[in-house]
Amino acid sequence: MRLFLALLALGFAAVAAVPANPQRIVGGSTTTIQQYPTIVALLFSRNGNTFFQACGGTILNNRNVLTAAHCPHGDAVNRWRVRSGSTFANSGGAVHNLNSVRIHPNYNRRNLDNDIAIMRTASNIAFNNAAQPARIAGANYNLGDNQVVWAAGWGAIRSGGPSSEQLRHVQVWTVNQATCRSRYASIGRTVTDNMLCSGWLDVGGRDQCQGDSGGPLYHNGVVVGVCSWGEECALARFPGVNARVTRYTSWISNNS
């Protein structure tokens, strides 16, 4: 889920929490939770009563969910819940309250470096064909350029467009780090070594978007990225940017 928040004033689209107009996977198609049992919908409430899908996450084990730090950053724990085991953003499956949220200690909200967090649920996530722990890329996981990766989520189907109540997925490709860094440097944005770029470079039309923040990016079924930010959505020149999971393998293990 990428969101337009305060950074929008700088011309920067962050895949942040609580979108004013949440957006979904661009250029993909509908799918089911049975195809992606490791993904969960993160629900947010402004008033503590009415919750709506605002970010995505990945099941680590029966009590912990991986997401983007910018989703829960600055919020009270009781503003967030986790919906597991459902194809649909706002119905079905099981809904879990949270006990705690752990933000990466080096998270930088200005450039979204180290944009990673772990939510601990108050109740166990029951595993079945619609809810399973994910395989997380290890520190030495080899992921080259132009590799097929898949993104999934409940974000917008176009930048500024309507939400998708049903889970969607899209095939994109990993983008060379130097190329991605250069493209974003041209508009004053920083791509660090902790980030992983993906999209359909110089073609566009496929991407994660607002509402997909925190959700997984898969390579051969292994989670290699956490949806973080981008310049609008699905632009030919600017790929999407994820937190690079291989940089956080130890931190994830030690905190879940």
Curated annotation (Swiss-Prot):
The record marks 207 as: Required for specificity. It holds the Pfam family Trypsin. GO terms for biological process: proteolysis. Transmembrane segments: none annotated. Gene3D superfamilies: Trypsin-like serine proteases. This is Trypsin, alkaline C. Disulfide bonds join 55-71, 180-197, 209-233.
